[in-house]
Amino acid sequence: VSSHDLAQMRPRRFTANGPLKGRIRVPGDKSISHRSIMLGALAVGETRVTGLLEGEDVLSTAAAMRAMGATITRDDSGMWHVHGVGVGGLLQPQQALDMGNSGTSTRLLMGLVASHPITATFVGDASLSKRPMGRVIDPLSTMGAEFTASPGGRLPLTLRGLSPAVPIEYRLPVASAQVKSAVLLAGLNTPGVTTVIEPIPTRDHSERMLRGFGAELTVDVAADGARIIKVRGEAELKPQDIVVPGDPSSAAFFVVAALLVEGSDLVVENVGLNPTRAALFDVLRLMGGSIEELDRRDVGGEPVADLRVRHSLLTGIDVDPAVVPSMVDEFPILFVAAALAKGRTVTTGLEELRVKESDRISAMRAALELAGATVTETEDGLIIDGTGGDPLPGTAEGTSVVTHLDHRIAMSLAIAGIASKRGVEVDDTRPIATSFPVFESLLESARA
């Protein structure tokens, strides 16, 4: 960390401050927000989006789609208006597309560009530039796109799309919704049928939303349980009015906070409960968490409910590795819940966490240990021996946990802090803005 970066860092000590009460609403779902902008930009006509997550990642997507010809504006009521260019209508961007910290923007937009006759350069921040893009480069190269990447298949990279691209049948070697989505999006402007075979189901927002925008998309389940997803290319997408449900990954922090802090009784409104995303809530219920669904409803093809969460004594469990793809981003906050549970929680099958915004396995072990938790790191997970419901000791004066520019680690340790005796010092709260700009103010209002 350079001294210049140190001057910019925003440390904060998060401390206990009473129970969480009342009703809160978390910002819109990040996955759905990204895809609303991208698909709206490929439709012909005006797509209107209410409840868009206005975090830095989604704004990176909006800036990139503008650079490729879409008109995207936000009105005073907070509604976003996207005037699309049509599938096949993307224009060559005049400058490099800056992806900031957003792996989702990068991988999905690479898919879009791959089947258009344009060349685009993708750049990102220090954290994103360490993340592997090879898993997307491989299938898109097979479709005919050409790549000049930094060593290890990383950013900055330049992609020259091919139109017409070659339709492929691609079996995912690793469970990744981003790789699946990149290939399906490339398939939109590719003649014929593009097929993705997914051995383990991952989040399915792309499939739901592509269908919602009018793409011809089918999903079949093979004898071995794999999902076979086909999209017919040269599609015409129709503009949509989209109401973005609350992000379950953001709701997760408040759900765990209310479970851990004595006396809490909190309603988190309008939470998206897509089954490929909401496994954390099932795991917390298995641990004994009181999480009740109120007013379950369907919004734009996505299941939504209000969650009433009450303080509960949790019990450690062995987490079934089969749920990993449905809660891959929620393990950092699950580790915090486990640290205050009664008994031992064992997690396995988490190799994917080592290549997220940071190595989330080792970063969470180090951070939780500083906060006084008992944690053992394994090759593919953590083993956590909980306090039995007592608050964590917290970090010593002058000691702060290292967030590695990772928003989920910063927010997870903030929640550990409000469930600790002396608080937890977080070295830098700036990364939180990538996914949840109002996190800190919402935390204050829930404890008011």
Locate the predicted segments by residue.
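Structural preference for solvent-exposed beta-strand-turn elements
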Residues: 1-448
